[in-house]
A protein has these predicted regions:
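Intracellular, membrane-proximal regulatory regions of polytopic membrane proteins
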Residues: 2-120
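Soluble C-terminal extramembrane regulatory/interaction domains of multi-pass membrane proteins
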Residues: 65-198, 203-208
Length: 208
């Protein structure tokens, strides 16, 4: 999917300090909205059809799960766009390679690929959830390691995107899996301390 490739390109830009590559990834991130909008429309139509047609009621649970996934993906795509914007700003102003932050962003890409593979298979939800959790952990380590505010913001966006991906992976999970949602909320509510010279991350601007 284009989204996973965009995250891979952002990671490569952070790994190498390549400003042109970062800009291309930002341009690609800005184009992701069309894909998510088309997915939302298709899922909404499918759910409406299933609710109206008794012969398709058996499809409702799967469609409801996919519709819930779509809602979380919409937030994650917005976070990705802010992540790309912050990456461009950092690379243009500094340009120093940051392999640890790049690794966190690359981890998001792997989570996106795994979530795409699990879209039609609720039993496969654990792999994308674990990959997103791992990416968030790497971002948390980066926040503690770097004093650069721009890097702190990038790492914070990785954590926000990872949380949305985790929620998407858990969509339609039974009640006994509610602990996973609680863990996601706790991950966001308790960010690590920032180093001297850094500041806590700010929420993404939904207008970007």
């Amino acid at each position: 999917v284009a989204w996973g490739h965009t995250l891979e390109e952002l990671a490569a830009a952070l790994e190498t300090g390549d400003a042109e590559r970062a800009q291309r990834a930002l341009d690609a991130a800005r184009g992701l909205d069309d894909n998510t909008r088309a997915l939302d429309e298709a899922l909404s139509l499918g759910c409406e059809t299933a609710r109206a047609a008794p012969l398709r009621w058996a499809d409702r649970a799967a469609l409801d799960r996919q519709e819930e996934i779509g809602r979380h993906l919409d937030f994650a795509v917005r976070d990705t766009r802010v992540l790309a914007r912050d990456t461009v700003r950092y690379v243009r102003a500094n340009g120093s390679p940051v392999p640890d932050v790049a690794s966190a962003v690359a981890g998001l890409g792997r989570a996106v690929w795994a979530l795409a593979a699990a879209f039609d298979d609720p039993q496969a939800r654990e792999q994308p959830r674990q990959l997103a959790l791992r990416a968030a952990g790497r971002a948390s380590e980066a926040i503690a390691r770097h004093a650069d505010l721009a890097l702190t913001e990038i790492a914070g966006q990785v954590r926000s995107t990872a949380a949305d991906l985790m929620r998407a992976a858990q969509a339609g999970a039974p009640d006994e899996d509610a602990f996973a949602e609680a863990a996601t909320d706790e991950m966001l509510a308790d960010p690590p301390d920032t180093p001297a010279g850094g500041q806590p991350t700010t929420p993404p601007d939904s207008s970007t």
